[in-house]
Amino acid sequence: NKNGIKDVYEDPSAPIEARIADLLSQMTLEEKTCQMATLYGSGRVLKDAWPTAGWSAEIWKDGIGNIDEQANGLGKFGSEISYPYANSVKNRHTVQRWFVEQTRLGIPVDFTNEGIRGLCHDRATMFPAQCGQGATWNKKLIREIAKVTADEAKALGYTNIYSPILDIAQDPRWGRVV
């Protein structure tokens, strides 16, 4: 926060309930709303791959809860940012830094990505679709696939991964079934 003092929400030694209450009491309606929103990463809603001066006039000037699929090699920027891997990590770090330093309260962004059959990144390991994985009935193999996906996501700086649904599908046309 840019007020020159360490607020309760910024103090990691303060009780979590006090930190949450302090942060919420300081947030505007716009900031709260933005924390419930997801932007699709570079080349999509987030038109620029790297922060620009224009970002301070966009809706995310008040922060954003989540950026999905940032610098994963898909969208208009392709592999230009996703590889080498250091470039992909640098991109997320630079975007994160912008949100922490340029928004009023400095709330970090959650970077998410798909992981239903491996990390959704143009250089990550891809695995068979969930139906194919499930047909093996091999729980150990599925756990190993999940570990590879998690390790690759963590190494690239993603903080949350969307994974397969553990539910019986009612409609086989649904994308998460295939």
Residues of each region from the PLM?
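N-terminal beta-rich core of secreted/periplasmic extracellular enzymes
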Residues: 1-178
